[in-house]
Amino acid sequence: MGNDLRTLSAPSLTILNNPAVIAVSQDPEGRSVTRVRRELNIAKDKYGVGEIQVWSGSLFGGDQVVLLLNAAGEDAQISASLEEIFLHDGPEGSAPQVSEEWEVYDLWGNRMDDALAQKILDADDKEVEKLWKQANWYNATEMSYKDGLKKWDERLMGKKIGKIAPGGTLSAKVKRHSVEMYRLKSIGHGGKRKVHAKEEL
């Protein structure tokens, strides 16, 4: 982090301390996400820049992370089929994961609210510890992200928002110049798979 923690704002704290997102960056598999789609024929911003991208990557335990990036000049409905999401595991829908059912977790769905974040920033050391415990916030010094993922700690999953049927599609309204981030968890079974990395992030 390149920011000054002494002048950190509440919204910034809620971004930096999101355990569901941090768990992806600390994933034991240590794999990169790959871009599976890029669209340029969309609305541009005032600088003449605009595109939509879909990124996907495998996670610990057979989970999958999916990012829907809207770098366009207006809000957009972005969809990604399981065939696209698991493109590097098998072309033209041949990946076994395409025929599975998946639970969808919004990794920003349980983000700390700004009011609590401000209380934490304003509190002294003793009060801060109390606030963290009351919030039941994930503490990586007490349990590593790897161990938390093994136990399927709900604080590392985000907010469950639905399911994707076999052969189905993930779809979301994404605000301009923003990104939505999801964890997919197979219902029934996950499993190891080959990863054919292309354009990595």
Question: Where are the regions that the model predicts?
Answer:
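Surface-exposed loop/edge segments in extracytoplasmic proteins
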Residues: 111-117
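Active-site-proximal substrate-binding groove within the catalytic cores of carbohydrate-active enzymes
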Residues: 1-110, 123-128, 135-151, 174, ...
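C-terminal beta-strand-rich structural cap/linker in extracellular carbohydrate-active enzymes
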Residues: 119-200
